[in-house]
C-alpha cells in the first residue's frame, strides 16, 4: 500500500458555508503542521479540534478549524487531518496548493476508501456501500446501504465461508492421505451442509430482485394504444403537466421518463408512444423505442377503455410482452366517461380479461380515471404493495450490488456441482476443487479474493474526496 500523504476536497464543489479538506497518510500531521499557525499538531491528542490559520509561507489563506486523528482510530486507519475552512472554491484551491507544496499529493478517486479497505478497516462490500450511501436518493436505498456498511452482508458471507472452509480442509486432508483411502469428511454431513448452503445462497440471490429495485429504482412502462390516456396518467401520478396531452392520437412520439418516490422507493415511470401499426416514420421510431422500454421494465401498466379494439387484442398484446419477472397491471381508464364501468371492475371487458389473463399473466385489474384522478392513489398503493412482495423477512440481508449477485450465483453453481459429485461418488480431488471455487467466489464479495483490475474499477467510481 502506498504510504504517500494524500489530500482532497471532501465537500461538494462550489460555494458553501463550510468546506472540508481531508489529509491522510503517515506524514499527514507533519504536512498540515507546516502550513498551520496555531498549536503544534504533531503533539496534540487524537480526536481533537484546534483553531488557527492556514498559511502559504507568510501569507494567511484563511481562518480554520483543524481536526486531528491518530492512526489507527481513523477512517483510513492512517494519521488523518480534516481542515474546515470558509467555503470558497478559491480558498479551497489555495489550501490544496499549499498542501501539495509541503509534501502531500492529490488523492485519486476513491483513494481514502481504498486505503480503509487495504488497511483492514473495512472489507470490500462495506467500501462499496459507502458509494451507495452517498448515491442514495430515497429512504429504502439509504437503509440498504447503511445495513451493508454496518457489516450485514459481511457477517452473512463470513458464516457461509466458515462452514465451507471447515469441510474444504477435511476434503483436502483426504487428498494428503489418498493412498491410505481414509475418509475424513462424512459424506452425509457434507450433503447436509450443501443443503444448508443452497438455502442460504438461494435466499441471498433471491433478495437481489428487491435490493436492485431499492438501489436503482423500478422501471414502470405505461403502455397502450394511441390516445388511451398514458400521458394524462403520467401527469396525474406526478401531479404536474409533464407530458403533452391531446385528443389527437399519436401525440407522444418519444418516451418521457420521470421518477416518483412512493413510500421510500423510486419508481421510474416511462410514458411510451402509443403502440400501433403506422406509416409515419417518426411515430414508428417512437413505437420501436417503446418496445425497448417494455423489455427493461419491471412493471407494465396497460391502459385501455371501452373504445379499445377489444379483449382479444389486449390479451394478444400482453402475451407478446409478458415475462415471468414482469408485473402486469391492467388499468381500465376513463371510468368517469362510461356509466357501465366502475372501480370494482364489473364491465364485460374486465370480466373477459380476468378469465383469460388472471392469474397466469396479471393479478391486478383496476378501474381508474387519469383525467379525474379517480383511484390514482389506489394505483400508487398497488405499486408499493408490489415492492413489498419482493421483500424477504424484515431482518433478512438484502443484496443490492450486481457484483455480489454474480459472485453468489457462481458460488451456488459450484456448491451444486459438489452435490452432484458426492451423489455420483466422484473423486475427492474434484470435490476439493469445487469447494475451493465456491470459497473464492464468496471471498470476492468481501475482497479476500480479488485483483487490482477489480479494485481499480470499483474505486474509480468514487468521488475524489472519498
Identify the residue ranges that each predicted region occupies.
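Inter-motif core of Ras-like GTPase G domains
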Residues: 283-307
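A glycine-rich (often HGG/GG-containing) alpha/beta subdomain
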Residues: 1-143, 147, 151, 322, ...
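Glycine-rich, N-terminal phosphate-binding loop of Rossmann-like dinucleotide-binding domains
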Residues: 87, 237, 272, 304-307, ...
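Short, Asp-centered acidic motifs that coordinate Mg2+ and/or phosphate
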Residues: 267, 299, 329
Amino acid at each position: 500500500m502506498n504510504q504517500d500523504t494524500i489530500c482532497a476536497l471532501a465537500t461538494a464543489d462550489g460555494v458553501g458555508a463550510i468546506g472540508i479538506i481531508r489529509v491522510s497518510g503517515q506524514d499527514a500531521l507533519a504536512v498540515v503542521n507546516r502550513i498551520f499557525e496555531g498549536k503544534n499538531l504533531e503533539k496534540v491528542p487524537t480526536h481533537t479540534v484546534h483553531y488557527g490559520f492556514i498559511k502559504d509561507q507568510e501569507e494567511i489563506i484563511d481562518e480554520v478549524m483543524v481536526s486531528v486523528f491518530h492512526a489507527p482510530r481513523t477512517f483510513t486507519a492512517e494519521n488523518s487531518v480534516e481542515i474546515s475552512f470558509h467555503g470558497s472554491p478559491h480558498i479551497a484551491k489555495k489550501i490544496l496548493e499549499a498542501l501539495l507544496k509541503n509534501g502531500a499529493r492529490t488523492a485519486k478517486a476513491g483513494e481514502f476508501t481504498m486505503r480503509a479497505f487495504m488497511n483492514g478497516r473495512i472489507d470490500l462490500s462495506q467500501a462499496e456501500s459507502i458509494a451507495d450511501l452517498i448515491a442514495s436518493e430515497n429512504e429504502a436505498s439509504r437503509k440498504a446501504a447503511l445495513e451493508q456498511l454496518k457489516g450485514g452482508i459481511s457477517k452473512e458471507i463470513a458464516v457461509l465461508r466458515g462452514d465451507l472452509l471447515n469441510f474444504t480442509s477435511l476434503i483436502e486432508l483426504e487428498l494428503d492421505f489418498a493412498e491410505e483411502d481414509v475418509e475424513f469428511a462424512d459424506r452425509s454431513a457434507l450433503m447436509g451442509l450443501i443443503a444448508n448452503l443452497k438455502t442460504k445462497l438461494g435466499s441471498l440471490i433471491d433478495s437481489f430482485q428487491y435490493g436492485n429495485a431499492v438501489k436503482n429504482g423500478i422501471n414502470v412502462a405505461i403502455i397502450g394504444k394511441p390516445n388511451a390516456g398514458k400521458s394524462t396518467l403520467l401527469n396525474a401520478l406526478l401531479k404536474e403537466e409533464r407530458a403533452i396531452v391531446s385528443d389527437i392520437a399519436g401525440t407522444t412520439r418519444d418516451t418521457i421518463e420521470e421518477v416518483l418516490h412512493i413510500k421510500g422507493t423510486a419508481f421510474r415511470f416511462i410514458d411510451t408512444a402509443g403502440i400501433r401499426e403506422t406509416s409515419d416514420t417518426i411515430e414508428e421510431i417512437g413505437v420501436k423505442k417503446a418496445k425497448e422500454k417494455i423489455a427493461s421494465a419491471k412493471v407494465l401498466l396497460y391502459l385501455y377503455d371501452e373504445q379499445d379494439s377489444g379483449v382479444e387484442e389486449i390479451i394478444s398484446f400482453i402475451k407478446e410482452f409478458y415475462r415471468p419477472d414482469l408485473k402486469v397491471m391492467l388499468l381500465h381508464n376513463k371510468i368517469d366517461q362510461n356509466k357501465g364501468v366502475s372501480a370494482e371492475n364489473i364491465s364485460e371487458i374486465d370480466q373477459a380479461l380476468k378469465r383469460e389473463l388472471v392469474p397466469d399473466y396479471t393479478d391486478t385489474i383496476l378501474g381508474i380515471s387519469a383525467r379525474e384522478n379517480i383511484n390514482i392513489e389506489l394505483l400508487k398503493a398497488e405499486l408499493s404493495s408490489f415492492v413489498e412482495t419482493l421483500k424477504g423477512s424484515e431482518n433478512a440481508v438484502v443484496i443490492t450490488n450486481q457484483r455480489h449477485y454474480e459472485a453468489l450465483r457462481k458460488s451456488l453453481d459450484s456448491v451444486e456441482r459438489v452435490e452432484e459429485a458426492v451423489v455420483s461418488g466422484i473423486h475427492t480431488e474434484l470435490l476439493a476443487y469445487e469447494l475451493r471455487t465456491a470459497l473464492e467466489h464468496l471471498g470476492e464479495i468481501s475482497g479476500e479474493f480479488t485483483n487490482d483490475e477489480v479494485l481499480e474499477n470499483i474505486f474509480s467510481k468514487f468521488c475524489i474526496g472519498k
